């Protein structure tokens, strides 16, 4: 779809669209972010003998809707910001991209793995709590003299929240004792995570 060239690169971008590739952003928000849709000779024609599945992923103009979220800047550089299926849409219409918050949290010392999601509560009046579930590097934290892992990460996340807009702030930190379940590509399987908060 796109690539950075040896002498033509932009930090954070996956590059300019390759020759003969058309890229558009479907239903962009106020920041220009939306679903990345592509059209070109390298795009599949559809799913074999499955017109319904094909119709689900192609729009009326023949663009393939990738399921990736991103934006194009004024010069046509493409940025990927997350996955559509991971997107958290709050009741006020604001979009929260978990991958953006996960990237910030992953830079905290002692974080081995992290997943951010919208917590599910049966009792809380505010059901829009953003949860950061962390699998820590327990050995590293132990060598750093951290006795209370929960308190350590609660403090780190509070500090991070001070730099975040209010609707993106993490409201709960969950610590897990084992790695997240992964698929054969070593990617975390998000749907297997218990998102309950009470």
PLM features: residue spans?
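Short glycine-biased active-site loop of nucleotidyltransferases that positions the nucleotide triphosphate
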Residues: 12, 123-126, 185
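Conserved C-terminal "lid"/linker of ANL adenylate-forming enzymes
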Residues: 113-118, 158-198
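Conserved AMP-binding/adenylate-forming
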Residues: 1-78, 84-87
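A short, local hydrophobic-aromatic micro-motif
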Residues: 19, 34, 45, 112, ...
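AMP-binding/adenylate-forming catalytic core of the ANL superfamily
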Residues: 40, 45-46, 69-164
